[in-house]
């Protein structure tokens, strides 16, 4: 959404939907307002240096990297923005380049291409069928909930 200026906040789309995304699936984040990674410059630098990593990778690096130890809330965010290798995260930002997005471990989709393909003004929340027959699950405001499949919830 336009109100999010950093992946720090926009990545609610990642950690609030990860239990609803199929292994091998793809999450497309259309984020026209995103122009940086971190809300604070030092967190932005940390994300740019390490990218989004799995929990195991972060825990290993945390043992030896002073900058990670100095900013634990930023270090935790590196995991919040990770799919843990389960699915692909594709970002369509308004203010970050392809090189910047790919440098942190995400796939890049040009914003104009994303808007042309997915038409957020037309899509309805839930399942939508694209003109080419692809079925996509659209969530207009991923920051407003927590999504999961029955299989991922188990007996909870």
Predicted regions span which residues?
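C-terminal catalytic subdomain
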Residues: 3-93
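Extended hydrophobic packing segments that form well-structured cores
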Residues: 84-156
